[in-house]
């Protein structure tokens, strides 16, 4: 069980220290107080006219706190993405080479007619492409498949790698240096990691020059890695959470259902709102237009501190997403 003090501290510390080799700034961002009158919108949902705030990251860019996730195994729908962009005002799309839908996504972006400069596009580097040269080639190939001249955010998908005779740390550092160069070049507006633990981030800090702008990790009522969240905030690393509905498992939990009834909101809206109120950039996935619209309508209400804590007590350290490679903590 997570301590109530730690959860409260994390919510109260939703102010991000923004720092890099040249600048240091403190930007207040109290997500728990966000509502439709806030002045941090990056897009407005067309159907409900609710503004979506943007989270500042350490290089000064801003990421919409709500995105649309994609995936493999039926986790992509051309029609749903176009609907999300045109009708729901979604501007943050998350994908990965591993999902196999970058080229299809390019078609959806084109059909939506949303200007490129209004979009935030994230994709990820698969461990099979780790290494300096292969990472560089893979990044350029992803941009080409997506039909864009630059990526807003490029992430190392997992801390593991599969290079015989070399340590994970060595390969991660070499790969990260390739990302740093693409960041300096402007091919990537921001670079980051996914599924990295504190130990991986500490090693990367020691071995490289640019601290990751983002760490994207599994985050939902049953998986609340507060130590990692707090570390990222101290180090100026924006924290993104995927799988906010726990692959649907959270939607039938009695606590979530009770809050759904109390707030007259769907169970998915309760989970997404809880995640956002914790200061987490939240990326739900859906291929159903009505679910996407529902997931966007989370800025017109707030959960009380008591109800936030009720969900906080659901932590069981349950991970629903794992990499098939061995030595994931290596």
Locations of regions flagged by a protein language model:
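Acidic (Asp/Glu)-rich catalytic clusters
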Residues: 106-116, 143-147, 205-208, 229-234
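Low-complexity, intrinsically disordered or signal/transmembrane-proximal segments
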Residues: 2, 7, 22, 39-40
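Short, acidic/polar
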Residues: 74-85, 131-145
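Beta/alpha (TIM)-barrel catalytic core signal, keyed to glycine-rich beta->alpha loops juxtaposed to Asp/Glu
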Residues: 127, 158-330
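Active-site mouth loops of central-metabolism enzymes
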Residues: 66-75, 125-131, 165-168
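N-terminal binding-site loop/beta-alpha segment at the start of enzyme catalytic domains
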Residues: 34-37, 42-119, 174, 246, ...
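CE4/NodB-like, metal-dependent polysaccharide N-deacetylase domain
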Residues: 135-156, 181-185, 237
């Amino acid at each position: 069980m997570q301590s109530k003090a730690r959860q409260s501290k994390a919510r109260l510390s939703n102010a991000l220290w923004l720092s890099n080799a040249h600048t240091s700034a403190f930007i207040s961002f109290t997500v728990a107080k966000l509502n439709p009158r806030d002045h941090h919108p990056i897009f407005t949902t067309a159907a409900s006219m609710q503004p979506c705030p943007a989270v500042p990251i350490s290089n000064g860019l801003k990421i919409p706190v709500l995105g649309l996730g994609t995936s493999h195994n039926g986790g992509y729908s051309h029609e749903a993405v176009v609907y999300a962009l045109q009708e729901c005002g979604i501007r943050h799309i998350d994908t990965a080479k591993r999902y196999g839908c970058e080229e299809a996504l390019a078609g959806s972006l084109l059909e939506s007619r949303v200007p490129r400069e209004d979009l935030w596009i994230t994709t990820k580097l698969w461990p099979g492409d780790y290494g300096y040269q292969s990472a560089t080639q893979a990044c350029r190939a992803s941009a080409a498949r997506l039909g864009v001249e630059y990526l807003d955010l490029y992430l190392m998908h997992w801390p593991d790698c599969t290079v015989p005779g070399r340590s994970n740390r060595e390969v991660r550092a070499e790969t990260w240096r390739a990302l740093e160069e693409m960041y300096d070049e402007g091919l990537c507006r921001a670079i980051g990691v996914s599924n990295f633990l504190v130990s991986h981030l500490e090693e990367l800090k020691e071995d490289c020059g640019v601290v990751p702008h983002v760490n994207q990790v599994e985050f939902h009522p049953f998986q609340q890695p507060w130590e990692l969240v707090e570390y990222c905030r101290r180090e100026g690393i924006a924290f993104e959470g995927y799988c906010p509905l726990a692959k649907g498992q959270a939607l039938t939990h009695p606590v979530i259902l009770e809050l759904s009834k109390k707030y007259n909101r769907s169970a998915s809206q309760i989970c997404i709102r809880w995640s956002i109120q914790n200061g987490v950039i939240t990326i739900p996935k859906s291929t159903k237009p009505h679910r996407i619209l529902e997931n966007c309508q989370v800025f017109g209400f707030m959960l009380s501190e008591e109800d936030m804590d009720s969900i906080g007590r659901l932590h069981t350290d349950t991970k629903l997403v794992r990499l098939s490679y061995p030595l994931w903590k290596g």
